[in-house]
Amino acid sequence: MSFLRKKINDVIIESVEISRATFKEAEDFKKLLNQDIDGGYLKIIVDLSNCTFMDSTFLSTIVTALKKVNKIGGNLKLVGVHSETQALLELTGTIKVFEIYETKDEALKSFTVQSISK
């Protein structure tokens, strides 16, 4: 299993359960994220704790989902970003568009804080 989906209240957590996320897995992950967004989930966490490498195609899939969910008032946050992925985010400039958290709990709490402050 490459991906694991968990629902906590109105938040979806998509965990990438492979060490190397590449173009080979990007299409399947894109389908999952689109299912989440099309299903009405506006709060998405992508957990990369088990993923030590990501290529630009896989990153593009996540950026596209972020843009899609942002357009309808939602957000997508990253958790557990490893150093190689961090370097890719910095190199591509996409680090500026993501909220990144160390843990799922921190990301979940950030959604709660956003809801209260709106």
Residue spans for each PLM region:
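Charged, low-complexity, helix/coiled-coil-prone segments
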Residues: M1-I13, I45-T57, K68-V69, L108-T112
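STAS-typified acidic loop motif
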Residues: S2-K31
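Short, flexible active-site-adjacent loop segments at beta-strand->alpha-helix junctions, enriched
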Residues: I18-R20, H82, K104
